Amino acid sequence: MKPATHRDKGEQAEQLACHYLQARGLRLTQRNYHCRLGEIDLIMEDRESLVFIEVRYRRKGRFGDAIDSITPAKQARLIAAAQHYLQRTGGAQNKPCRFDVVGITSEKGADNIMWLRDAFRVES
């Protein structure tokens, strides 16, 4: 059996995050939305809000926590991709939107999930 690749681990982390959020009442709208401006891992609905979610995975102790890896440049790409999604879908019926981050760290085979709601905002 070949070892898991970086992409495999990312997909596993996204699946874990999706199940975690669904267990907390969010409904999946789309996974892995791609456009030329960037990618959004998960797009979900939380009551009346549309939620754009970035999932980050890190092994404990390597380069800080998963959530710390969301740089301003990454935030800008997520915002641009979300704007593209909203334009393409007609503004998603003018629902309020937010950006969440799910950080998953693994230590000694155990996963720790941290959900940061409203992790950053769009500056107007």
From Swiss-Prot:
GO terms, molecular function: nucleic acid binding
NCBIfam families: PRK12497.1-3, PRK12497.3-3, YraN family protein
Annotated PANTHER family: UPF0102 PROTEIN YRAN
Coiled coil: none
Family the UniProt entry places it in: Belongs to the UPF0102 family.
Protein's name in the database: UPF0102 protein Noc_0355
InterPro entries (alphabetical): Restrct_endonuc-II-like (IPR011335), tRNA_endonuc-like_dom_sf (IPR011856), UPF0102_YraN-like (IPR003509)
